[in-house]
Structure formats: C-alpha cells, structure tokens
Amino acid sequence: MSEHQWKPTASIQTLLSRAKIIAEIRQFFSERGLLEVETPILSEFGVTDVHLSTFSTKLISPFQKKEKTLWLSTSPEYPMKRLLSAGSGAIFQLCKVFRNEEAGKKHSPEFTMLEWYRPYFDMYRLINEVDDLLQYILDCEPAESMSYQFAFQEYVGIDPLSASQDKLIEKAKEYCLENAEREDRDTLLQFLFNVAVESQIGKDKPVAIYHFPATQAALAQISSEDHRVAERFEFYYKGLELANGFCELTDANEQRHRFEQDNKQRERLGLPIHQIDERFLAALKAGVPNCSGVALGVDRLIMIALGLENINEVIAFSIENA
C-alpha cells in the first residue's frame, strides 16, 4: 500500500465547491416549497431492473435464527413513492445510492443522487424544472428538447419506432457491434443511441430527450397519444447523462406485471431473481397521486460545474481509495 493512499482524491478546494453546490440545490428546492426527506438505504427487496446489479449484505440479529439478506438502495424511488401515497406532497432527497458496476471516469459504485417528485406535474413541466435547476447551478443556456424518435432519425438515420429488426442489426454492424444478430430490439436501440446519439448531443447546452420507446418505459406511464412511446425523459450535457425522469406509473397491477416481466428476463439472462417489493405495490394500490419524478447524478453535475473530467475528482475518496 502506498504511503500516499490515505489522501483524498478530491482537492479541499473542490470539496468546498461541492458543499456550496449541494447547499444551492437545497436552497433551490426550499424556495419552491419541497420537503426534504430521508429514506432507508437498506431494504429486504432488491430491484428487478435487468440493467441494475445490487449490492447485498446480511443482517445478523440475536433475536433471529437466520441471517436476513438486505439490499443496498440503487435509488430512493420506492420509499419516496410510499411517502407520496401517505400524503407528503412534493418531496426531494439527496442521498447515497449503490450500484454494483464497474468504476471509471464517469461511474462510481457509490454515488450521490438527487431525486424529487412533483404531484400533478406532467413530464413536460418537470423537464422545465430540471432545466431551471441546471441553469441555477451551472449558469448554462436553457436546455434544448427533442423526442427520442427525432434524435434517432437525425443522428442514426432510421426511425427507431418503425425500423425492422434487420435494419437495426445492419446499423449496429456499421457501428461495429459484434454478434448484432443475437441481440434483441431494445439492446440494439440502446447500443445505437449510446454510440450515435449521445456522442453528438449536449455539447453546448443541456439536451432533454423525451418519449423513449414503450419497451424502455421502466416505471413510466405509456403515452396516451402514442402507445409506442413512454412518458420518460433523460438529460444530457457535456458528454454525460445527467438525469432520468418519468411521468410516473401509478397502476399497481401494471407495475406488478412489469416486475414479473423483469424477473422473467433476469431468468433468461442467468441473473438473480429479486423478490417483488410488495410494500411499494401496496402504496400504489392505496393511491399515489399523479406525479412526475426525476433522478439526477449529483457527482456528474459537480463535474460539469467545476470543469472536471473524472468523477473521482469530485468525491472525497474513490472506491479504490475508500
């Protein structure tokens, strides 16, 4: 072990700037009347999303004969929606979340998330509020908005909602995806979006991409105007995905169906099956108000604010140095 390994990966000046930005985030929401909340980091329920890998730990209690597996939070979404169901009104949270994925310049397995929910906001109104926050923190230009379909046609040259599987495979091969013919439609779309769209947008101003394909709805409602798309959006700026938001699904039966479909896909992929969060579904059944919500990566926001290229430069200690 190096004698210098004890030192922080962020400079003290950066940590001072980080604290100032986090204080400004709290001020932004306080001025708008949102309640700051705290929810558990540990839960007996993991997440079914096939794209997320969850850390686990064991609860060892003298009052229990068996150890209990608990999962570290990948997002405070489920407990925050339980608060909404209980009548909290508009809420926000700044918290640590954990995703068992590789570390790199843009990723850390432990990172800080800002998540907030707005009862009776539609997707477009929440997009505007994310834009307001970015201008407030970054002093940047107003965001540009475009649909997923438009962005795909502009930068990939095909319509993602109507293109055939063969056309998607052909395009993916142009971008050097090996064994493209083995991949499903969503994997091909996500690959093409990552390599051909993300690299071209948000260079000079933030960009909001909305109406992702319905097959990528996650916890978003399906659009009532076009059932091929979901009321889901993402923000991109300076080469980083900053935020992911939804007009939230509030139908407990549909949400249960999506969880079950996730677990079926997990089984096909050889991934662990996760127990469905019945407390969350009970809250949906009891009645979560129509709302929109969004999660934003705070460390990435700070990277942009300070002009830094590596996430380890904005956190006190990297995972390798923790």
Swiss-Prot record:
PANTHER family: ELONGATION FACTOR P--(R)-BETA-LYSINE LIGASE, LYSYL-TRNA SYNTHETASE. Pfam families: tRNA-synt_2. Keywords: ATP-binding, Ligase, Nucleotide-binding. It comes from Avibacterium paragallinarum (Haemophilus gallinarum). InterPro entries: Aa-tRNA-synt_II, aa-tRNA-synth_II, aa-tRNA-synth_II/BPL/LPL, EpmA, Lys-tRNA-synth_II_C. ATP binds at residues 99-101, 241-242, 297. The keyword ATP-binding applies. Its EC number is 6.3.2.-. The lineage of its organism: Bacteria, Pseudomonadati, Pseudomonadota, Gammaproteobacteria, Pasteurellales. This is Elongation factor P--(R)-beta-lysine ligase. GO terms for molecular function: acid-ammonia (or amide) ligase activity; ATP binding; lysine-tRNA ligase activity; tRNA binding. It catalyses: D-beta-lysine + L-lysyl-[protein] + ATP = N(6)-((3R)-3,6-diaminohexanoyl)-L-lysyl-[protein] + AMP + diphosphate + H(+). Gene3D superfamilies: Bira Bifunctional Protein, Domain 2. Belongs to the class-II aminoacyl-tRNA synthetase family. EpmA subfamily. GO terms for biological process: lysyl-tRNA aminoacylation. NCBIfam families: genX (TIGR00462), PRK09350.1 (NF006828).
